[in-house]
Amino acid sequence: MNNMNKNDVNKIISVYNYKKRFFLEFDEEQGWIIADNIAESLKQKEHVEVSFNRVPKVSFIFITSMLGKLLICHGFSAKELEEYIFYTGLNVGIEAQIEMAIQQVSSRPIVTMTEFRRKRED
């Protein structure tokens, strides 16, 4: 996904450590918490390694919650995420989810229900 040198990493965030006890799935709340931790480092222009080691699968909701919060709430660009975040322990499924989520969250304008109704009526 990116070619960052591992020596440039300032902080390592293990997704596995955020897993709720006794739950197998990662949810949107955990995605938001991880996003806030990543954002702390990105605001300082620090490189972050997000490790998916020991995580066999995550839901698309988890990935979009994490990346959506970084892009929308914290205001980072997709380019900044690509430049400062280094992912490890990815399998093909998680990597595809990250790519789809970044594309979905960064390229589509957010449509409110009022705007949606207006578009349907036209």
State each model region's role:
Residues 1-17:
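Short beta-strand/loop segment at the start of cytosolic alpha/beta domains
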Residues 1-4, 66, 100, 113:
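Detector for methionine-enriched segments
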Residues 17-48, 52-102:
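Amphipathic alpha-helical interaction surfaces in cytosolic regulatory modules
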Residues 106-110, 114:
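Aromatic-anchored, charged helix-turn/loop surface patch used as a conserved interaction hotspot
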Residues 113-122:
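A cross-taxonomic marker for long C-terminal extensions/tails that follow the last structured domain
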Residues 7-10, 21, 41, 120-121:
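Conserved catalytic alpha/beta core of Sir2/sirtuin-type deacylases, generalized to analogous enzyme cores
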Residues 5-8, 77, 112:
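Serine/threonine-rich low-complexity intrinsically disordered regions
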